[in-house]
């Protein structure tokens, strides 16, 4: 899918092969594999999965094009529901401390999709979708720019550790 292809390209462009794994089985009692796992110090893994429900996102853009506020609101609610289900699934399948971090990342492959997700507020609770997903399911949504920044900061941290280790050995 577009999401998987985009995530693959981003991770492979920003991290050396030693810092990530692909199609990783997180739990022994399942056949489910997370698309990527970023290796942290101590071989702790950050699960990274992608999600792009194209039809639900297209319904939002169609609503905007038709200047139909009700259609946009309905489509945004359906998109939020799809990401809530994805976050729940990712939590259940891939977050398994101490093998992994106590959170996972779900990658939204376009900035426009990421914008919709970060701006969506539950009409009844007024809670932002991104906050709800983190609180309930320990899932962080990242778009291309935020994931790039996260991966670059991890890579710089790993480089600093290498330099520090080298200096200690001298």
Across the structure, where does each feature detected by a protein language model lie?
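Amphipathic, heptad-repeat alpha-helical coiled-coil/stalk segments that mediate oligomerization
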Residues: 1-170
């Amino acid at each position: 899918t577009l999401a998987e292809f985009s995530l693959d390209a981003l991770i492979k462009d920003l991290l050396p092969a030693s810092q990530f794994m692909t199609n990783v089985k997180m739990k022994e009692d399942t056949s489910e594999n997370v698309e990527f796992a970023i290796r942290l110090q101590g071989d702790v893994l950050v699960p990274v999965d992608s999600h792009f429900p194209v039809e639900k996102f297209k319904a939002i853009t169609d609503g905007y094009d038709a200047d139909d506020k009700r259609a946009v609101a309905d489509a945004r609610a359906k998109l939020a529901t799809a990401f809530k289900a994805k976050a729940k699934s990712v939590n259940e399948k891939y977050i398994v401390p101490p093998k992994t971090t106590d959170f996972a990342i779900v990658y939204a492959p376009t900035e426009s999709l990421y914008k919709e997700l970060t701006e969506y507020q539950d009409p009844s609770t007024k809670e932002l979708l991104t906050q709800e997903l983190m609180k309930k399911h320990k899932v962080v949504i990242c778009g291309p720019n935020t994931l790039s920044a996260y991966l670059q900061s991890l890579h710089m941290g790993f480089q600093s550790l290498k330099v520090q280790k080298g200096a200690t050995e001298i």
